[in-house]
Amino acid sequence: MAKKSMIAKQKRTPKYAVQAYTRCERCGRPHSVIRKFKLCRICFRELAYKGQIPGVKKASW
């Protein structure tokens, strides 16, 4: 889990647009965030296995 101070800091609008970054909406993780779902890879994987993300299925080839 992310620190509460970091989550609060990220909610403020940055002085410059370059300073903005994505953060997982479920756990607050700043790295490896999938933009389309606004989730980190770990949360995305958990929810996909449970079938809670519509239209997502495990790939096999």
From Swiss-Prot:
Zn(2+) binds at C24, C27, C40, C43. InterPro entries: Ribosomal_uS14, Ribosomal_uS14_bact, Ribosomal_uS14_CS, Ribosomal_uS14_sf. GO terms for biological process: translation. Gene3D superfamilies: 30s Ribosomal Protein S14, Chain N. HAMAP family: Ribosomal_uS14_2_B. Part of the 30S ribosomal subunit. Contacts proteins S3 and S10. This is Small ribosomal subunit protein uS14B.
